[in-house]
Each structure stands twice: as C-alpha cells, then as structure tokens.
Amino acid sequence: MRHYIFSLFVISLSFSQNLQIRVVGKMQMDIPVLGPFKMTFDQTVAPGFLKAEEKIEAERFYAGWLMNGETGEIMIDGTEKILKYDKDEEEYWLQSPEDYFKEPDTSSDDTKSVSFSFSSDDEDDTPPIFTRTGGKEIESVHGFRTKKWITTIAFSEEKMMVFEEWFVDKLPLMRLSDSLESAIKTKFNPDQDTVELEQFDFSSNIFIREMDSLTTLKPIPGHAVKINFLVYEESDDPKMAVGFEILELYAEPVDTGYFVIPEIYERIEND
C-alpha cells in the first residue's frame, strides 16, 4: 500500500512538471460610496514560473479614476527580482522580494479591503438565526458540476446576510495551482516559513466557523466556484453585494514563452 501511494505521488509530481495551470476569475462588487465595479484576474502558474494579471473596472467616474487599471506580475525561478507591469501605460519595472513581501500598510487608503457593519439604535443581544437550503440538484456553472446552497444569517427581520454558493466536491487543479504558486513564491521569499496566497474567500463557511457556538450548521464541504454575498438592512435592495466566480480552470503543456511581456513596454523606476 505504501509503495502504491508513493507511486501515485511520483506520477502526480511528474505530471505537474509538464503542465501549466490557468485560472481566470471575476469579482463584482456594489458597495456604498464606490458603487459597482468589477475585478478580473488571470493567473497562469507552472513549475518555476508565475504570471498574474488583474483588471479593475469601476462604473462611477471618481471610482474609476481611483481604481481602474490593468496590471500584472511575473516570477521566474532563478531571477533575483519580480517583474511588474502596467498594461495601460505599457511600462514595466523590477521589484525586490523584500518590497514585494513587505507587510502592507493597513493604514493606507490603497488597501484592497472592504468592511461593513450593521447600524443599530437598540441594545438587542438576540443571537443571529442561521438557516440553509439547497444542496440537492446538480447545476452546471462554467462547466463545473455544482450544488447550490443558500445560507441566511438573520440578525433581525430587516438585517441579514445571504450567501448563494455553488460548490463542487473537489477541485484538484486549483490545489495544484496553489501548490505551484506557493512553491515559486517561497523561492523568492525563503526566510518566511509559509507564504500566504491571495484568496477570494468570503463564503458562509467563514462565518459558520467564527460563530460555531451560535449555530448547528456545519461548513459546506468542497470548494466554491461561485458565490453571491448580499447584505440587507431595512430595504428590499441589498446594502452591499459581492459576487465571485471562477470562469476558467484548465491545464495545458508548459509554454515558457508565455511568461514574458511585449518588447514595446518601456522600463521605468517605480519606487
């Protein structure tokens, strides 16, 4: 049995050496002040290579002025710095691993985080009510065979969070992609024990785990490939809406020529 498991591990490792994994996803948000905007990410990773691009599009003018852009980064094992680039400006620059992995300044306005809270004029300590439906029918979402779940966390009759989630049982290509991404980033940052990967995770499972003493619901097993997160407060229209979905996830033979930028890009110093 041990020999069989070891053989499977060797086959899997050899299999990944000849492949690159591409994942394309989209996040849409409609939040107070900024309004609606969309972020698309496109990442391809192979053994010793990583290329990631991100595009942000906001509908409101002032939000677009602050946020719109299309940027990318490339990591190649054996090089000393990370290549960063701006597709709109057709410019690129080099960034040291020290700056790349530096802890972000959370006090800065240039942080990609969103927070929200429920307003309340009373001192009602009633615990939230958790309900969940679904998980029976198979639905196809971008080629994934999923089961849809709807989880509601109600703080009152007018204040609640609703999660619409499409889960698959397993997503082995995503696990392989995360493993390859972690490996290349660890090589650029060897002094850190573990490298944190950017994850778009705001599923109901987070709230279930954090509030497990208040509910008998268990985290949904598997991997979410699509999530709609809605916050309601004294209105039939959501106060905030966030959507995330994986549009593409596939493996193909490694093409090292993909991990480059156009020759017309101009190098700049970007401190």
Region spans (language model):
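Positively charged n-region of N-terminal signal peptides that target proteins for export
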Residues: 1-4, 143
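Sec-dependent N-terminal signal peptides
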Residues: 3-13
